[in-house]
């Protein structure tokens, strides 16, 4: 299954390269890493909430308790639409967690390999600067849940008298989560409180990455575990660029972590080979496992 996904992605990249160069002028930060001052308890809590999106519906019922959070709403099936769960959390407020790729779903897999950069969706395009491009497949996946997600956020913010909104995602769900976080920030009252994204691939071009920094840079938390290969795709040679700052857990699945400032920092994850497997991508993030369909169901926080 992993080989099939890599082959599909390679074919997509080859098609893009044959279409001509995109943007090779994005910069790379040379700043040295700094000590981790991010809230690891919140990272652990967020990891548990996103793990539950991979669990069977029989274990995903409103009222389910995961750490300090209570499940209020769920939508999507992981096939034609990625699943998202909405929780009320003591630490995170209204927390929306978005599922990553379902390896048994062709539709889900195809979202990962539709690599052409496209304009932002018409519903939110006017909020972005001219020249913004995002990956087709990631945006397609987000748009399929967008209306249900926005309605649910607005409903439960009102019901719970809660202004804080936190967007969480893993893998494909992290890419969708970045688009969702920007959408909520740009179009909804109060915007987002934070976004926690695990194993985030590149989502857009340098214009997009710079706009993310401008709008939510102080609320953006990207976490990379060990030798995870997913944050290396789609490649920069195709015009894609990460926003600034990530937390790198190294060795993988440990609690040793540093923050790497700026966009595409030349230190950190770029200095080690990528592992051609999912062990670090589906790893342990500050004592909480994101194991996808092989992970704990119901999800547990802080027990690894």
Swiss-Prot record:
Q: What is this protein called?
A: Secreted mono- and diacylglycerol lipase LIP1
Q: Which family does it belong to?
A: Belongs to the AB hydrolase superfamily. Lipase family. Class 3 subfamily.
Q: What is its main location?
A: secreted
The keyword Ubl conjugation is annotated on this UniProt entry? no
Q: Which reaction does it catalyse?
A: a monoacylglycerol + H2O = glycerol + a fatty acid + H(+); a diacylglycerol + H2O = a monoacylglycerol + a fatty acid + H(+)
Signal peptide positions are: 1-19
The entry's keywords = Disulfide bond, Glycoprotein, Hydrolase, Lipid degradation, Lipid metabolism, Metal-binding, Secreted, Signal
Q: Which GO terms describe its biological process?
A: lipid catabolic process
How does acidity or alkalinity (pH) affect activity?
Optimum pH is 5.0.
Relate the protein's function as given in its record.
Secreted lipase involved in Dandruff and seborrheic dermatitis (D/SD) probably via lipase-mediated breakdown of sebaceous lipids and release of irritating free fatty acids. Shows activity against monoglyceride and diglyceride substrates and generates free oleic acid from the substrates mono- and diolein. Able to cleave the oleic acid from both the 1 and the 2 position of the glycerol backbone as 1,2 isomers of diolein were converted into oleic acid and glycerol. Can hydrolyze 4-nitrophenyl palmitate to release 4-nitrophenol and palmitoic acid.
Which GO cellular component does the record give, naming just one? extracellular region
Which residues, renumbered to this chain, are glycosylated? Answer: 102, 253
Instruction: List, alphabetically, the Pfam families matched.
Output: Lipase_3
Activity control, per UniProt: Inhibited by different metal ions including Ca(2+), Cu(2+), Fe(3+), Cu(2+), Zn(2+), Mn(2+) and K(+). Activity is inhibited by the known lipase inhibitor RHC80267 and the newly identified compounds ZINC85530919, ZINC95914464 and ZINC8553032.
Q: Which superkingdom heads the taxonomic lineage of this protein's source?
A: Eukaryota
Give the originating organism: Malassezia restricta (strain ATCC 96810 / NBRC 103918 / CBS 7877) (Seborrheic dermatitis infection agent)
Comment on activity versus temperature: Optimum temperature is 34 degrees Celsius.
EC number(s) per UniProt? Answer: 3.1.1.-
Q: Which residues are annotated as active site?
A: 171 (nucleophile), 228, 281
- Localization per record: Secreted
* Gene Ontology terms, MF aspect: hydrolase activity; metal ion binding
Q: List the disulfide bonds.
A: 55-297
* Gene induction: Expression peaks at the optimal conditions (pH 5.0 and 34 degrees Celsius) similar to that found on the human skin surface.
């Amino acid at each position: 299954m992993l080989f099939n996904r890599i082959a599909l992605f390679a074919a997509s990249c080859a098609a893009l390269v044959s279409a001509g160069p995109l943007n090779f002028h994005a910069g790379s930060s040379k700043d040295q890493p700094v000590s981790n001052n991010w809230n690891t308890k919140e990272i652990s809590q967020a990891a548990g909430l996103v793990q539950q999106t991979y669990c069977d519906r029989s274990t995903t019922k409103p009222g389910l308790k995961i750490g300090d959070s209570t499940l209020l709403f769920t939508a999507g099936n992981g096939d034609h639409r990625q699943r998202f769960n909405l929780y009320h959390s003591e630490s995170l407020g209204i927390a929306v967690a978005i599922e990553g790729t379902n390896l048994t779903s062709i539709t889900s897999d195809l979202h990962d390999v539709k690599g052409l950069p496209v304009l932002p969706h018409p519903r939110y395009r006017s909020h972005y600067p001219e020249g913004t491009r995002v990956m087709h497949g990631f945006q397609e996946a987000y748009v399929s849940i967008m209306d249900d997600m926005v309605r649910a956020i607005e409903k439960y913010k009102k019901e719970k008298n809660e202004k804080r909104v936190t967007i969480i995602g893993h893998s494909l769900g992290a890419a969708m989560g970045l688009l969702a976080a920007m959408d909520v920030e740009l179009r909804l009252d109060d915007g987002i409180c934070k976004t926690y994204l695990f194993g985030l691939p590149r989502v857009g071009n340098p214009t997009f990455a710079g706009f993310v920094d401008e709008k939510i840079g102080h609320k953006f938390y990207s976490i990379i575990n060990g030798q995870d290969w997913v944050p290396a795709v789609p490649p920069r040679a195709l015009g894609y660029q990460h926003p600034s700052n990530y937390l790198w857990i190294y060795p993988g699945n440990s609690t040793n972590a540093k923050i790497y400032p700026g966009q595409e920092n030349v230190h950190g994850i770029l200095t080690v080979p990528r592992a051609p497997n999912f062990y670090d991508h589906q790893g342990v993030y500050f004592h909480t496992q994101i194991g996808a369909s092989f992970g704990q169901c119901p999800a547990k926080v802080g027990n690894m």
